[in-house]
Amino acid sequence: MALTSEQRAEIEAQRSEPQLTSRPTVAAMENLLFTPFEVLDHGFLRVVDYMGDDGAVVQAARVSYGRGTKKVSEDAGLIRYLMRHRHSTPFEMCEIKFHVKLPVFVARQWIRHRMASVNEYSARYSILDREFYLPAMDQVAAQSSSNRQGRSDALDADTAHQVLEILRRDASQCYDDYESLLNPEGRGLARELARINLTLNTYTQWYWKIDLHNLMHFLALRADPHAQYEIRVYAEKMIEILKAWVPATAAAFEEYRLGAFTLSAGMLKVVRRRLAGETVTQENSGLTKREWSEMAAVLDGAS
């Protein structure tokens, strides 16, 4: 992970000057505030601010003036109810802001989640660093034959080395050309034009602020095993932060979203028929092959 000297100085300054506040704070979050967590080869993720806690969710749900009940178990029970019944607005009362360094191709997946505020490092005004994402050997994988947007098994070592060399060579050459285009003693091309030649594995940075409800939606999709590895590792780190920030909400989220599976009306009929002792197959279930395999993977542990 490469932090600039300016970023390190900023982090140290922020951590050395605690702020007085009357608002609720979370001790675990205060301890990790501003701390960069390494992700991928040059990326990082750090919390720069947050608002609210589990108590804020409860307070909003009850529209109360206090901080919830005196019994943590009652507050946790209400949060579980809200999560189970897919209430959203109480969770929207909490917000968190991240500083993220990530490859451009990951950023383009990430930005599809539109319910957030984002401000990205501008290559129109500044020059991007010579930093590129190169996957680890075990992540250099073949295209999946069953999933058009997924990968399969890792390639053999020799092929993986060749792939990595191509990625490294192309990224380096494009950055050399980027510098050459920018050189005021040479072509002196505008930054907003010179950047278009850079590869998608170039690292960018942004500040990303989102409410708790939409954060959990993001995590449910991007921490899923089917999500691309390079964005999933960011989501997994964010789940660790979620547990420190709102532990009761995080527990309910894991119970009712991450570790859960939604049955369609047709799937529920199949379950009831099986409970009644009927032998149900995909052919007589009324489900498509994909629906059947997804349900079987959950109910029977089959693929």
Swiss-Prot record:
Keywords: FAD, Flavoprotein, Methyltransferase, NADP, Nucleotide biosynthesis, Transferase. One of its GO terms (molecular function) is flavin adenine dinucleotide binding. DUMP binds at residues 109-112, 120-124, 195, 222. A motif (ThyX motif) lies at residues 112-122. The active site is at 222 (involved in ionization of n3 of dump, leading to its activation). Coiled coil: none annotated. Binds 4 FAD per tetramer. Each FAD binding site is formed by three monomers. Residues 43-256 form the ThyX domain. Residues 1-21 are annotated as: Disordered. PANTHER family: FLAVIN-DEPENDENT THYMIDYLATE SYNTHASE. NCBIfam families: thyX (TIGR02170). This is Flavin-dependent thymidylate synthase. The gene is thyX.
